[in-house]
Regions:
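Residues at the starts of beta-strands that form the adenosine-phosphate
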Residues: 51-53, 78, 137-138
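Short phosphate-binding loop-to-helix
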Residues: 70-107
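Short beta-strand-to-loop acidic/aromatic patch adjacent to the donor-nucleotide binding site
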Residues: 105-117
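N-terminal glycine-rich phosphate-binding loop and ensuing alpha1 helix
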Residues: 4-62
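Acidic helix N-cap motif at the loop->helix transition within catalytic regions
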Residues: 63-68
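Residue-level signal for inorganic ion chemistry
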Residues: 10, 37, 95, 114-115, ...
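Hydrophobic C-terminal alpha-helix "anchor/cap" residues
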Residues: 41-45, 69, 99
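Conserved core of the sugar-phosphate nucleotidyltransferase
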Residues: 107, 120-170
Length: 170
């Protein structure tokens, strides 16, 4: 294969266990009549540079995710839905395995990994990430931290308060 491939990977394998009140995983909660994950997907689909977007979702929601892609997107052929893993890293592993199986891999190919419950991602952030990964081999997005962070060795006593200007939310 001669063409450098660019893949989007949306991680949606969680079941929202930290959201005790949720009946369904938070990525499927609706805002203005649409699941959050669909807003994220629609923003990723605006980036024409993505050859495919893989969505790693919980096995119990594979069929539902396929329905949502058909219902809400105009490019369902660019979306591939796979089973997510137990943990975030397992889902990333499943995506990379699926890409390897489906497409093969070239060392210059790019995979942009994004959390499905972060729907406000912009085309600029995604395109800048693709460019940075192409230039440097890898990149991670981050925003300057606005909250004061506390560090504790034992989880009980604050050891230090890191300088906020050196901290970023990833």
């Amino acid at each position: 294969k001669d063409k450098i491939m660019i893949y989007g990977a949306m991680l949606a394998g969680g079941v929202g266990s930290r959201m005790k009140s949720a009946v369904i995983p938070k990525q499927f909660l609706e805002v203005e009549g649409k699941p959050i994950i669909i807003y994220t997907l629609q923003n990723m689909l605006k980036v024409d540079r993505f050859d495919y977007i893989y969505i790693a979702t919980h096995k119990d929601y594979l069929a539902y995710m396929k329905e949502m892609v058909q219902k809400y997107t105009d490019k369902p052929e660019k979306v591939r839905i796979i089973e997510g893993g137990k943990e975030r890293m397992d889902s990333i592993h499943n995506v990379t395995d699926a890409i390897l199986k489906d497409e093969g891999v070239h060392e210059d190919d790019v995979i942009v990994i994004h959390d499905a419950v972060r729907p406000l991602v912009t085309e600029k952030i995604l395109n800048d990430s693709i460019d940075a990964a192409g230039t440097y081999g890898a990149c991670v997005c981050g925003l300057p931290a606005v909250d004061t962070m506390l560090y504790s060795e034992d989880g009980k006593v604050v050891t230090t308060i890191p300088e906020r200007s050196k901290l970023f939310n990833g």
